[in-house]
A protein has these predicted regions:
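Single-stranded nucleic acid-binding surfaces, predominantly the OB-fold ssDNA-binding core
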Residues: 1-75
Length: 75
């Protein structure tokens, strides 16, 4: 499996930034997940609760700044 260009984590929120090469240069996309425990195992979910929103906003701002700094376009 491909590795993300960058992974940011704040609390239980994780954002992965994926880089893809194109003729116009690098292009980025991202995924957002929330970690939770299912018994003894940590699992990821794309469902977010109301109280997750402030952390998601913070990490998305950091991801956006990283993408701007590292060039490239959004997918």
């Amino acid at each position: 499996m491909a590795k993300p260009a960058l992974e940011l984590r704040r609390g239980l929120i994780k954002v992965r930034i994926w880089r893809r090469r194109s003729k116009q240069g690098p292009r980025y996309s991202l995924s957002v997940v929330r970690l939770f425990r299912n018994g003894d195992h940590w699992t990821e979910s794309t469902r977010l609760g109301r109280d997750d929103i402030p952390l998601v906003r913070l990490v998305l701002d950091e991801a956006y700044e990283w993408m701007l700094t590292n060039g490239g376009e959004w997918e």
